[in-house]
Amino acid sequence: MASETQGGCGCPPTEAPVPPTGGVHHVFLAVNDLARSRPFYAALMPRLGYPGTSDEGGPVAGWWGACGSFWLKQADPRYAGATFSKDRVGLCEVAFRAESRAQVDALARDVAGFGGKILDPPREYPEYVPGYYAVFFADPDGIKLELVHIPK
C-alpha cells in the first residue's frame, strides 16, 4: 500500500478494485461526542467489513474496507446536543449488508455491550423483499443503523 491518502479524505488508498462509478465511496457522520462514539464504532465497524482504521485520537476517526470507508467527526459546537431524527431532511439511516442471518443475530446480541441500542430486534421484513432479515439499532447519538441479510 502507498502512504498517500485517496481523494483528500484522509482514508488510505485501497488495493481492492474500485468501480469507476456507482457504489458509495464513504459515509461521514458528525457526532455530539467523538470520544463517546469512538468505542462504539471501533467495536462495530470491523464486524461489518471495515477492518482498517485511522484513529489516532485526532479530530476524525475512520474505518475502511473493500466497500469504501466510514468516518466520524466532532459536530460543530453550534449544534452541541442536537439529536438525530430520521424524519428531518438529511440522513434517514445507514444500512450495512450481512453475510448471514447469524451475523445479524450476533450483532443484535452484542450491540448494547458497546454502547448502542436495539430499535427493532432481528426479524424478517417480507414487506421489503422476500428473505429480508434485519436488525435496526442506534449509535450513541441515536443515529439509526441497520444490518441486513438478503439471501441470493
Model-found features: residue ranges?
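Short glycine-/small-residue motifs
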Residues: 144-147
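Long, continuous compositionally biased terminal/linker segments
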Residues: 11-13, 17-18, 61, 65-106
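A generic structural-conservation signal
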Residues: 54-55, 120-121, 151
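Core segments of cupin and vicinal oxygen chelate
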Residues: 28-76
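Vicinal oxygen chelate
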Residues: 31-36, 94-140
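N-terminal beta-strand motif that seeds the catalytic metal site of vicinal oxygen chelate
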Residues: 2-38, 94, 151-152
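A short acidic/small-residue loop/turn micro-motif
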Residues: 126-127, 150-152
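Glycine-centered tight beta-turn/hairpin loop motif at sheet-sheet or coil-to-beta transitions
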Residues: 67, 140-142
